[in-house]
Curated annotation (Swiss-Prot):
One of its GO terms (biological process) is sodium ion transport. Keywords: Cytoplasm, Ion transport, Nucleus, Sodium, Sodium transport, Transcription, Transcription regulation, Transport, Ubl conjugation pathway. Belongs to the COMM domain-containing protein 3 family. InterPro entries: COMM, COMMD3. PANTHER family: COMM DOMAIN-CONTAINING PROTEIN 3 (PTHR31159:SF1). This is COMM domain-containing protein 3. Residues 124-193 form the COMM domain. Component of the commander complex consisting of the CCC subcomplex and the retriever subcomplex. Component of the CCC (COMMD/CCDC22/CCDC93) subcomplex consisting of COMMD1, COMMD2, COMMD3, COMMD4, COMMD5, COMMD6, COMMD7, COMMD8, COMMD9, COMMD10, CCDC22 and CCDC93; within the complex forms a heterodimer with COMMD2. Interacts with NFKB1/p105. Interacts with CCDC22, CCDC93, SCNN1B, CUL3, CUL4A, CUL4B, CUL5. Scaffold protein in the commander complex that is essential for endosomal recycling of transmembrane cargos; the commander complex is composed of the CCC subcomplex and the retriever subcomplex. May modulate activity of cullin-RING E3 ubiquitin ligase (CRL) complexes. May down-regulate activation of NF-kappa-B. Modulates Na(+) transport in epithelial cells by regulation of apical cell surface expression of amiloride-sensitive sodium channel (ENaC) subunits. The gene is Commd3. It is found in: Cytoplasm; Nucleus. GO terms for cellular component: cytoplasm; nucleus.
Amino acid sequence: MELSESVQRGIQTLADPGSFDSNAFALLLRAAFQSLLDARADEAALDHPYLKQIDPVVLKHCHAAAATCILEAGKHQVDKSTLSTYLEDCKFDRERIELFCTEYQNNKNSLETLLGSIGRSLPHITDVSWRLEYQIKTNQLHKMYRPGYLVTLNVENNDSQSYPEINFSCNMEQLQDLVGKLKDASKSLERATQL
């Protein structure tokens, strides 16, 4: 597992008994799993009276580091021994390693389901519609007399089977630029498929 320096510092702070005693560690670890797996979870998990004695900046940094470590472990489908070895390298004691690994094993299936539901591909444009919007005056004192275009792209997301819309407004130059870039992309795709 490759984690950034900032995340590693947060994990090492979490491992330090001087910063987090065993009760605070357990509460923060559960809060990290809860914030990832429960859509209704909010920051109230960090408002536990036992965590009030910890500097809020350190608390949030360690919470984010723990959540990142959990997500990376789930992403790479890390087993207990690999996670244990990583936590040992981060100066965790045996008790904290055991608690972290137990929480991870208990929530591993939910975590993998969550990560599996995240899309892996970009949406595909299936249709486009537009309408002319003519601005006569803005909130400024001068008049504008220039057309604008309201564009709606209908897209299909293969991973979630949903059909959302992307709406935006642009002026004539921006629309011409968009059309030119789409034509260039189409030609590039045609050349790539012919190779």
